[in-house]
């Protein structure tokens, strides 16, 4: 493992409408089978819908707040010590926490059946911005799991 080459971060892909790296990443998370233009339409429609009820001037404010609220601060990773596997709580890298938050928001939007994707994504973004919804519940579950396994924190590596 140690002899492998260093992996560098990719250059961020910004979206054309808002020139935002955050929205660009969200579009990539929504995209399936390489259909970027469809993913862009879904995300832009969701941002417009999520921003309708707010008095915010900046349309990205709602989505930024939603991702901030869904970001996990700690997570657990399995660590094998002497025949036993422990769930060890670790702090999450900022890039990973942002990625997890977006993944959770998109996945829970996809799981809402009977609703078009742009509406489901808009609802999930609105709820996450208000500290509610499935993605925030998932973050709380991850935090509870880390809290419950705090005794194994000394196994950090």
UniProtKB/Swiss-Prot annotation:
The taxonomic lineage of its organism, from the top, reads: Bacteria, Pseudomonadati, Verrucomicrobiota, Verrucomicrobiia, Verrucomicrobiales
Encoding gene, per UniProt annotation: rpsG
Q: Does the keyword rRNA-binding apply?
A: yes
Assembly and oligomerization: Part of the 30S ribosomal subunit. Contacts proteins S9 and S11.
Q: Which GO terms describe its molecular function?
A: rRNA binding; structural constituent of ribosome; tRNA binding
GO CC, any one term: small ribosomal subunit
Q: Which HAMAP family match?
A: Ribosomal_uS7_B (MF_00480_B)
Note the superkingdom of the native organism.
Bacteria
Q: Which GO terms describe its biological process?
A: translation
Question: Matching InterPro entries, A to Z?
Answer: Ribosomal_uS7, Ribosomal_uS7_bac/org-type, Ribosomal_uS7_CS, Ribosomal_uS7_dom, Ribosomal_uS7_dom_sf
Family matches, as Gene3D superfamilies: Ribosomal protein S7 domain
- Protein name, please? Small ribosomal subunit protein uS7
Q: What organism does the record attribute this protein to? A: Akkermansia muciniphila (strain ATCC BAA-835 / DSM 22959 / JCM 33894 / BCRC 81048 / CCUG 64013 / CIP 107961 / Muc)
Family membership noted in the UniProt record: Belongs to the universal ribosomal protein uS7 family.
The UniProt function text for this chain reads: One of the primary rRNA binding proteins, it binds directly to 16S rRNA where it nucleates assembly of the head domain of the 30S subunit. Is located at the subunit interface close to the decoding center, probably blocks exit of the E-site tRNA.
**Xref: Pfam families:** Ribosomal_S7 (PF00177)
Any idea which UniProt keywords this protein has? Ribonucleoprotein, Ribosomal protein, RNA-binding, rRNA-binding, tRNA-binding
């Amino acid at each position: 493992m140690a002899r492998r080459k260093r992996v560098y971060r990719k250059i961020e892909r910004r979206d054309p409408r808002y020139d935002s790296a955050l929205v660009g990443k969200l579009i990539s998370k929504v995209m399936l089978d390489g259909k970027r233009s469809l993913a862009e339409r879904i995300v832009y429609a969701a941002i417009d819908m999520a921003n309708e009820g707010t008095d915010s001037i900046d349309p990205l404010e709602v989505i930024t707040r939603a991702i901030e609220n869904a970001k996990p601060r700690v997570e657990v990773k399995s660590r094998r010590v002497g025949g036993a596997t422990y769930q060890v709580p670790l702090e999450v890298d900022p890039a990973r926490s942002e990625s997890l938050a977006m993944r959770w928001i998109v996945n829970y939007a996809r799981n809402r059946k009977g609703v078009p994707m742009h509406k489901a994504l808009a609802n999930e973004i609105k709820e996450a911005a208000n500290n509610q919804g499935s993605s925030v519940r998932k973050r709380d579950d991850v935090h509870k799991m880390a809290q419950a396994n705090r005794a194994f924190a000394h196994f950090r590596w």
